[in-house]
């Protein structure tokens, strides 16, 4: 069975793919998530989601996962050490360029899977521009943190102050990675 990951395949294997595959393009960010989580938390969460999806649907062959674009647009975190960020214009242009090349190669179905709240609008703009340039392209935008019932599982206090690096993201990260949050900060 072929890998579900584009970057695991050879050029010859990619050339034989059906052009009606759904290409999942993961978007994350490298930024601070408090003193207890790694700067790559957004990517770790997406990797966990994608690996869970693959395990749940191992025989589903309609999709292929593209490499994660892990350096996102996170200017709101630039004052924190460890943040790697592109400015908004360059980031949007980069997305359009990558997906545009795939459209030229006749891929037409995409899922933008995002794990950084600060780039939702960037993906909206990029998707709109791609659809206007390349006809018959379908793009579904999904954000792991915006699902039905989301507000019911997060403590009200956390919703007031934002869940970035909070209990919600910490729980998901620890669950998927089996890493322990830095206990000294959490006073465990």
Where are these regions (language model features)?
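Single conserved hydrophobic/aromatic residue that forms the stacking wall/gate
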Residues: 178, 185-188
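Extended, histidine- and acidic-residue-enriched regions that form the cofactor-binding/catalytic faces
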Residues: 1-111, 117-180
């Amino acid at each position: 069975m072929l890998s579900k990951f584009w970057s695991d395949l050879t050029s010859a294997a990619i050339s034989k793919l059906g052009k009606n595959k759904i290409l999942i393009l993961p978007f994350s960010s490298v930024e601070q998530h408090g003193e207890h989580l790694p700067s790559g938390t957004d990517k770790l969460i997406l990797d966990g989601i994608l690996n869970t999806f693959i395990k749940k649907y191992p025989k589903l062959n309609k999709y292929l996962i593209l490499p994660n674009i892990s350096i996102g647009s996170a200017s709101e975190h630039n004052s924190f050490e460890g943040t790697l960020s592109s400015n908004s214009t360059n980031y949007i242009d980069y997305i359009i360029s990558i997906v545009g090349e795939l459209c030229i190669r006749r891929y037409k179905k995409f899922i933008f899977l995002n794990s950084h709240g600060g780039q939702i609008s960037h993906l909206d703009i990029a998707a709109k521009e791609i659809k206007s340039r390349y006809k018959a392209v379908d793009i579904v935008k999904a954000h792991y943190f915006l699902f039905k019932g989301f507000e019911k599982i997060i403590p009200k206090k956390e919703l007031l102050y934002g869940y970035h690096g909070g209990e919600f993201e910490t729980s998901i990260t620890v669950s998927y990675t089996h890493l322990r949050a830095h206990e000294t900060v959490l006073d465990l």
